[in-house]
Amino acid sequence: MAQARLNLKGVSALLLDSDQFSRGLIASMLRGFGMESPVTGQTGAEAMAYLHGNSIDLCIMEAMLPDMSGAELIRWLRRPEMEKLRFVPIVVLTSYAQLRLVSAARDGGANIIVRKPVSPQSLFDRITWVARVARPFIDGGNYAGPDRRFQVVDPPDGNYKRADDARRGPSSAGPAQPVNKLVQAVSKGPSQ
């Protein structure tokens, strides 16, 4: 069975990871998906400085940055003043999948949290899932981000692992965040 291919040519991404090796490895994966030059950084301050004058289509960040938590940076991005950037899909990577870190990232407004080490196939699947699953964007008093309730959303790899998942079948989602280049790249289907 042929695997789908994702071509991220024209998609801009910000990759934040304090570990140089991990950052380089993930950047190589993104280039393998067709992304020409992901912007990389180590700290939340670097990200904030870059984002004040630039736009991105995807943000991939470590859950704990040297100067702040990923959740703090996500909340900063999801503020109303950030206009277009507040809807950017955010993938949080973590080596420590402690409930506290995962909950903080989710409650901050992350689209998905992925445990490291991450394989190219796993990263591909998660990026594709984030782009394809139209989760409603919630803008409430204490929270701004994708709907945190996963009860009606298919698993990222499409594999139903529980008996009640198979009975429920694929879901349909409501209105989502605006379409960006990432969503368009995934919607085009396999690259040629």
Regions found by a protein language model. Give the residues of each.
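C-terminal output helix
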Residues: R100, V118-A131, R135, D139-G141
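Two-component/phosphorelay signaling modules centered on CheY-like receiver
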Residues: Q20-Q42
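Alpha4 helix (beta4-alpha4-beta5 surface) of REC/receiver domains from two-component response regulators
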Residues: A27, E72, R86, A97-I112, ...
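Active-site residues of response regulator receiver
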Residues: E62-M64, T94
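Short amphipathic alpha-helix used as the core "switch/output" element in two-component signaling
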Residues: S69-L85
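The feature encodes the CheY-like receiver
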Residues: P66-D67, Q98
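CheY-like receiver
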Residues: R132-Q192
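Acidic, metal-coordinating helix/loop segments flanking the phosphotransfer/catalytic sites
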Residues: T40-L58
